[in-house]
Amino acid sequence: MKQMNQITIYSPHEINVAEILKNTPRIPHKKGNPGRSNKPVIIDMVCAFDIESTYLPDIEQAFMYVWQFQFGEYTIMGRTWEEFLTFLQRIRDSIKKNERVIVYVHNLSYEFQFLRGIYKFTAPEVFCMDRRKIAKCEMYGAVEFRCSYIHSNMSLDQFCKKMKCQTRKLTGTFDYLKIRYPWTPLDDTEIAYCINDVLSLKEAITNEMQADGDNLETIPLTSTGYVRRKCKAAMHRKPAWYQYIHDQLPDYELYVALREAFRGGNTHANRFIVGRILENVHSIDRSSSYPDVLVNHQYPVRYFVNRGPSSMDRFLKNKNVHKRACLIRIAFHDIKLRNYFEGCPYLSKDKCRNTTGGLFDNGRILKADYLETTITDVDFDIIDRMYEFRDPVILDSWYSSYGDLPQEFTDVIKDMYRIKTALKGDPDNSILYEKTKAMINALYGMTAQNPLKLTFEFFDEDYHIKEIDPSEELMRNNKNAFLVYQWGCWVTAWARAELQAMIDLAGDGVHTVSQFAYCD
């Protein structure tokens, strides 16, 4: 036991684990929620875990020399993995089989690389968001580690600042290059660096839950979980929402076409001025672009009907006369920029297929003898203005009706934006401001989430891609959907169209350098 700055630091064997857990309340499951009945009962105690490691460059090997565990109000430090495993086993032996202690780790993916060397994980014990990206893992059927970095999408220092923690991650003079072993004595400064990480993380999670009215059972696992929860509740208030959404959900064939058409923002360096230093540059920030287009543009709101190959006349009639949302696979012959000095060519080489005779600028198409691509009607309008081409052929086509997104959904967006604007600069509501700002930023990610993202499992001491039948998996995921994937495709398309309109207003950026504008 060591006393330092009014904090008592215990070694693992000095803690009466059984007595602490016996006197800690359990979080009851919400009544009327049958889905929770089979889930573990959560111990109502916020815990945090962290390790410090040394890297030996000669053998390219890292090892842990100290670990720290914030066990509720108790701060624990240990020096060996044997101590750590024994401590976890004492937790296991002190609770029921259906109970769990929740422990937050900032960047669990790093600690997991050490944990996998001391514990044989099975596939059900590890939740991978990607290869080597661990959202949570479980040990001994008793302790669940959750990644607070994935939860907050912030560094620990940023997270603690935004949650107004009294304890902060220490920064400055700590020598991370010093070789330390489990038997190396640590001075008070080094110990302070170690324990502050778990003290501050525990405080940040606690402050956040208090601000949001959450507990360890209801707190979202990821940063996008907050906005998903809010929007899902809003959609459930829409009359016949389930039928409304499920009438629009794509089948596998349409999903593939939507994946082909989906792309993100339009970011590119003007080939004529890249590397030059410009003067008299004026910048324009298109604030909250994705929330803006979600509220102020229309989207496909009926099921897409596949019409197969189509003539250009039929496509243009559907687009311009009937004002339908269009998704097309199209081939262009002899396509090239109308303006040679165009600084941001729209067509991306990665989103085109079977391209021949192409001339490219850092992945963008300046011209090509032939190419195929999948686009929305919004994309087509941009391409038609920017490029000239011959004999376009529509290889496949889908059509839907345009309409506003559900008011229940857009009201949430407007309310969040209103709150963020009202609370900006208000020190008494800084946590709510930061949470609302983060939720606004997460709106796009929620709408554009790929329902068939690769799923990884960890077993046999390695990562494996989970084998699935994509069509069956899509049907399974569709059962729980409260948004439709095509909305995400159109969100980015409308945002690119708005950005392109600003670029067009700014000029070509070469002959009007004094009026050049960078649009973000």
Report each predicted region and the residues it spans.
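N-terminal accessory regions of nucleic-acid-interacting proteins
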Residues: M1-C47, I51
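Conserved acidic
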Residues: V41-I42, E60-H106, F112-D520
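Activation of the activation-loop gatekeeper triad in protein kinase-fold domains
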Residues: I51-E52, S287
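Short N-terminal binding/cap micro-motifs at the start of the first secondary-structure element
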Residues: Y55-I59
